[in-house]
Design a protein with these regions (language model features):
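Glycan-recognition and catalytic cores of secretory/periplasmic carbohydrate-active enzymes
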Residues: 21-169
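Bacterial Sec-dependent N-terminal signal peptides
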Residues: 1-22
Length: 169
């Protein structure tokens, strides 16, 4: 290709891209909050209802009774006596459960679930140290070891806590 052809091709591209940017083909898209969306189809609606009415209750039961995830926070909050039991990253699973309930409550109000989550959140708030630190593995163990081993999932758990807090606005 010679220089004239290249210049002509570049000029044509610039001209058409400028025209396309100025030309509007329809309405501007406006974002909306998902709380303003109602799912009514035959595929997703029943699944979301099952999630709200069954799955979330099972998740809460798993965190509260099958594992010690809620209990660890109640112990760290001073509500009940005990010691840490479970996996080092168990806090994150509780936070993800809270996030799931929070998003579901946006479109499927359920006072029982909301009250249960509020109780769990009260344990979390009471367990948090004055400096903001919050991880039951260390709160109920050796606090001098916090932030010393990134394989212990402190940042991972913190990220899930933040996501849960955003969801449970």
């Amino acid at each position: 290709m010679n220089k004239k052809s290249i210049c002509l091709a570049v000029g044509l591209c610039l001209l058409t891209s400028t025209w396309a940017q100025k030309k509007s083909f329809g309405r501007k898209m406006e974002p909306i909050n998902f709380s303003q969306v109602e799912i009514t189809d035959n595929f997703w609606k029943p699944r979301l209802e099952t999630h709200a009415n069954t799955t979330l209750g099972v998740c809460i039961n798993q965190c509260e009774y099958t594992t010690n995830r809620v209990k660890n926070f109640a112990i760290a909050a001073g509500v009940i006596p005990g010691k840490f039991e479970g996996l080092v990253y168990d806090d994150s699973d509780l936070y993800k459960m809270i996030e799931g309930v929070a998003y579901s409550l946006t479109n499927h109000r359920n006072d029982l679930l909301e009250n249960k989550i509020d109780t769990i959140i009260s344990y979390i708030a009471k367990a948090q140290k004055e400096d903001g630190y919050l991880m039951t593995y260390y709160l109920l163990g050796d606090m001098s070891q916090r932030w010393t081993d990134m394989d212990k999932h402190e940042m991972y758990c913190c990220g899930h806590l933040i996501e849960a807090a955003i969801a449970y606005d």
